[in-house]
Amino acid sequence: LLAYEIEFPEEAHAFDPEKILKLKTKFKDWSIKERLNWILDNFEKYSQIVGRRNLALAGLLCFFTPTWVKFNGEMQRGWGNVIFCGDTTTGKSETIRKLIRLLNAGMLITAETASAVGLTGAATQVSKEGWFVDWGFLVLCDRKLLAVDGAHKLSLANWAALAEAERSGVV
């Protein structure tokens, strides 16, 4: 994949201020628990996946986790990682797929088709045009959700690439 333009969620200005004000008014006297239940109830209606609120909540917490946090005067990494474990056909992939679609931020890939180069990127040479960087999914999903379905099938090299990128914040 070659990205010519990347739009980050915080730079998008597609919010309707009137709708935000309506939500603010609606939530004014609600507790955090009531607000969260309203969000999860509406996600169940949107996704048509019932009984997987725990997965939706984990995905939302991961997406809205701050990228960096100032702690004791130092900037610390703050991005979140979530793993969904469970039996097959229990709604894990479909829940995150619907969440990614709703937030319009991220992608779901399968471990069978993932490679270290596909996750991080590679330098590619094109004859007579020089070199360019072919960015992988980790870079393309910066500040978005990247879900790897069947992550237990990733090779050790892929896990190493993911672990190093997660540890350092650099691909």
Question: Model features per residue range: what roles?
Answer:
Residues 3-57:
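Charged, amphipathic alpha-helical linker segments immediately N-terminal to NTP-binding catalytic cores
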Residues 36-171:
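Conserved ASCE/P-loop NTPase catalytic core
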